[in-house]
Design a protein with these regions (language model features):
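C-terminal beta-strand-rich structural cap/linker in extracellular carbohydrate-active enzymes
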Residues: 369-422, 428-433, 455-499
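Active-site-proximal substrate-binding groove within the catalytic cores of carbohydrate-active enzymes
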Residues: 174, 180-369, 379-391
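Bacterial N-terminal signal peptides
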Residues: 7-18
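Conserved structural scaffold segments of CAZyme catalytic domains across common CAZy folds
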Residues: 20-119, 125, 277-312, 322-327, ...
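Disordered, acidic Ser/Thr/Pro-rich linker "stalks" and the adjacent N-terminal cap
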Residues: 292-296, 307, 451, 465-469, ...
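Surface-exposed beta-strand/loop patches in extracellular or lumenal glycoproteins
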Residues: 335-354, 424-444
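Surface beta-strand/loop "capping" patches
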Residues: 306-327, 398-431, 669-690
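Aromatic- and carboxylate-enriched substrate-binding clefts and catalytic-loop regions
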Residues: 71-257, 648-653
């Protein structure tokens, strides 16, 4: 394996040296094709990665390569592999040897199996105070490229600035590295490198990190958390020699693919597509989309380097066209609550030269759809759904896609590996589509739809495809009602608590795992387990699961790493049993006296129990490190709350007839305020009524609270036939006990989300908004769906 790796790398280096004279000192020009990258920040934080976890992650990317043909050019270690925050390291240190017992060799070899090179986060200095120390640093950094074939350094001011007296040493080191690899990528994050700045390939665009609802949060209402990310713009001159920090796949994952389309095909910087953190947290059915976008970009990356900004008055915010005179990719977006239809001009306005009488138009996102041939100079209409992006190709060339269909929306699952091209056919319930197979680059010997042979498709004939279900009578995305001011209701407390019990304060990554569900893919499961089983993830005590794991060494705690994250330093403890339950007692355990703060041992406390969020039964117990809360007299209950939450709890359990009960449906939160405490008292209310007679799969309600309301100053919920339904999600996200950094917030324009379940259909619903101050807002309710509520069939085409 090592001999093969060295041979392959020698071939790469030889080809690079042939055009070394054409590359500038920074290793790339504005027309250098992009490189795809993953970097590991948030998969680990400043403690750094380990060899074991990295191998697991690399095997995940190898699975994407082997299953879908996806190629990742660069896998970059983030902080802590060698250097760390405010400190330089060495590959000879005990710390490094503990993290990487066999060094970088096995990792470089694993990466090479799927065509990937490693990269690393580091500082620009570390040259010490003597010539020998400086030489040791230079040799170590150069060896990463010369011996282990690294392709990227991400140099960050978090480690430290380059001392002026080391400018020449840095310049010498980088010249040595570029002798080995002229196209080596050097990312400059907020550094003054003096004369060595010329070695920088990129600079950080706007200084923005893209961890959703941590460093990038919505400040306007929207159907999802990533709307602010979708509003990002490219540099004014469309320079590509900058870096936008990529697309974070760790938190608030819905609509991630729109974010990636705009990053890869819109901004299309020198690193694109660029992702980071925890892509294994996507759902199993989303990995084909991830691979498809990487593959599509790779197919066309040579021409995507030339960009054209389209007139905003015609094409909307930050519409871009990329490509050459015969093929263009156009990115459109819609940052409003209603669908927007744009007219794409098929001529020089969008970058096409007149070399053909007709232009082929195909949409690639949010699904693939043939939009037909049109005369050069004509217009074609494309509708962009609310708070979404759309990717369209216009071309006068012959089709380059391996598989191309017309007459039906579809997504490509796999057209690269194995002998079968797999396509997901999409259609609305109860609708019929006339599908044809277009001339494309692949040739096929057989075709089946859901296992049924469809030979007519291979003969160029139309095939009728009908999807099950009842045809929708209304748009899946629509406005339902505008809430009107009213008196604060007597049950405002119940409306408030419904959302406290529906939501959680877990780390954002734990929320993403819940969103995506179990995986059937071993490589995905291994990467998830490697992340969540890290000792630091457990040690930071940021997941309510640790209350119910029968492990006295784990805990769920109020995080104070970044100060007091509670609103007005106040929060209660909320426990949802998941169903009405009869218990003799609830037992809460903690480590020590400090951990039960603000409670004090042997003092009497009240807990409150409820079956319906409206009627609460107080019970008295004695506080301590093991608290027995008597619940038998209250009868069946589902909800338990403490007005004041202990800082740290290790276990919460229930006992019935002397036996511990199952806790698999239990969950808890610890950052929400008790109603009536810490400024949490409704002073204004808005109410809206509507009848929900139709909702497609994946539908959810958006209660958009438009206007200024202050941080944590607005709340929302539903009432249905006297029952209270909370909002389990909100943008910006509810407060969390964070893994990497504290969650962001906004003082305006919250959007609360409620998934639509079958028991809501055909019912009269009341939507409520409460505010805790005197500011005026304008709440309204929308219904939408994610993903688009298509039914699906699978088309399999056996390749010749």
């Amino acid at each position: 394996m090592k001999r093969l790796l060295s041979f392959c790398f020698a071939l790469v280096c030889s080809s690079l040296l042939l055009f070394a004279q054409t590359l500038p000192t920074g290793g790339a020009t504005e027309t250098t094709p992009s490189k795809s990258e993953y970097f590991s920040w948030i998969n680990n934080t400043n403690e750094g990665p380990t060899a074991e976890q990295t191998l697991t992650n690399l095997r995940f990317f190898q699975w994407l390569h082997d299953r879908y043909g996806m190629v990742l050019d660069l896998y970059a270690f983030d902080a802590g592999a060698i250097d760390g925050a405010k400190i330089y390291g060495s590959m000879r240190s005990e710390r490094f040897k503990k993290q990487f017992p066999e060094g970088f060799g096995p990792l470089s070899e694993q990466a090479a199996l799927s065509g990937t090179r490693l990269g690393i986060w580091c500082g620009p200095d570390g040259f010490g105070s003597t010539d020998s120390e400086a030489q040791e640093r230079e040799d170590m950094m150069a060896s990463l490229v010369e011996k282990y074939h690294f392709g990227l350094f991400k140099m960050d001011a978090v480690c430290g600035q380059l001392r002026p007296e080391q400018y020449n040493r840095f310049d010498r080191m980088m010249k040595r590295i570029r002798q080995t690899d002229p196209g080596f990528v050097l990312l400059n994050h907020r550094l003054d490198l003096g004369p060595g700045t010329a070695h920088s390939t990129t600079f950080l665009l706007g200084g923005e990190e893209t961890y959703i609802d941590v460093h990038m949060t919505n400040d306007f209402t929207a159907t999802h958390h990533r709307a602010k990310a979708l509003s990002r713009t490219s540099p004014k001159d469309l320079t590509r020699l900058t870096e936008d920090h990529g697309v974070c796949l760790s938190s608030c994952l819905d609509y991630w693919e729109d974010d990636l389309v705009l990053q890869a095909f819109g901004r299309e910087l020198i690193l694109a597509p660029e992702i980071y953190a925890n892509p294994w947290l996507l759902r199993d059915d989303e990995f084909p989309t991830l691979a498809f976008l990487f593959n599509l970009h790779r197919d066309y990356r040579d021409i995507l380097v030339k960009g054209l900004r389209l007139p905003a008055e015609k094409y909307g915010h930050e519409a871009l066209s990329r490509g050459n005179a015969t093929t263009r990719f156009i990115t459109l977006r819609n940052l409003t609550w209603n669908p927007v239809t744009y007219e794409i001009q098929l001529d020089s306005e969008t970058g096409l030269d007149k070399k053909s009488k007709r232009v082929k138009v195909r949409q690639y996102h949010p699904y693939i759809l043939d939009l037909g041939y049109h005369p050069y100079g004509s217009k074609v209409q494309v509708t962009v759904e609310p708070f979404r992006a759309t990717l369209v190709k216009i071309t006068t060339e012959a089709e380059r896609d391996g598989i191309a269909l017309s007459g039906i929306p579809y997504q490509i699952i796999n057209d690269r590996t194995g002998g079968t091209t797999e396509v997901k056919l999409l259609g609305m319930p109860g609708c019929t589509y006339q599908m044809t197979l277009e001339r494309c680059t692949q040739r096929f010997s057989s075709a089946t739809i859901d296992g049924k042979t469809e030979s007519a498709l291979l003969k160029g004939q139309k095939v009728s495809v009908t999807f099950p279900g009842q045809k929708p009578q209304k748009d899946f995305h629509r406005h339902l009602t505008t809430l009107q001011p009213c008196q604060v209701p007597n049950d405002a407390e119940s409306i408030y608590y419904a959302t406290c019990f529906a939501a959680d304060n877990n780390a954002l990554e734990a929320r993403s795992l819940k969103r995506s569900g179990e995986t059937r893919i071993p490589e995905v499961k291994a990467a998830r387990d490697a992340f969540f089983n890290q000792s630091l993830f457990q040690g930071r005590e940021l997941w309510d699961r640790y209350l119910f794991d029968s492990n006295p060494t784990t805990a769920f705690s109020i995080s104070f790493r970044f100060g007091d994250s509670r609103t007005n330093s106040s929060s209660g403890f909320f426990l949802d049993l998941g169903a009405l339950t009869e218990l003799d007692e609830v037992i809460m355990e903690s480590f020590d006296e400090y951990s039960i703060t603000p409670l004090k041992s042997e003092e009497g406390q009240n807990a409150y129990l409820s079956a319906d969020l409206q009627h609460w039964t107080p019970v008295t117990f004695r506080s301590g490190t093991r608290m027995h809360i008597p619940t038998k007299a209250a009868g069946a209950f589902r909800y338990l709350r403490l007005p004041d939450c202990p800082f740290r709890l290790t276990e919460v359990s229930g006992v019935r007839n002397g036996q511990s009960v199952d806790r698999s449906k239990w969950h808890a939160s610890n950052l929400f305020r008790t109603y009536g405490q810490g400024g949490c008292q409704a002073t204004q209310a808005w109410k809206g009524q509507f009848h929900l007679d139709e909702a497609l799969e994946g539908s959810y309600l958006c209660i958009a609270v438009n206007g200024e309301h202050g941080a944590e100053g607005a709340w929302a919920g539903l009432k249905v036939e006297g029952k209270y339904i909370g909002c389990p999600d909100r943008a910006p996200s509810y407060k969390c006990n964070p893994w990497e950094f504290q969650s962001g917030n906004s003082e305006k324009n919250y959007t609360f989300y409620i998934p639509i379940t079958a028991d809501l259909i055909g019912k009269d619903l009341e939507a409520w908004t409460l505010t805790f101050n005197d500011q005026q807002v304008k709440p309204e309710v929308w219904i939408t769906a994610y993903p688009i509520p298509f039914q699906q069939k699978e088309l399999h085409l056996q390749r010749k």
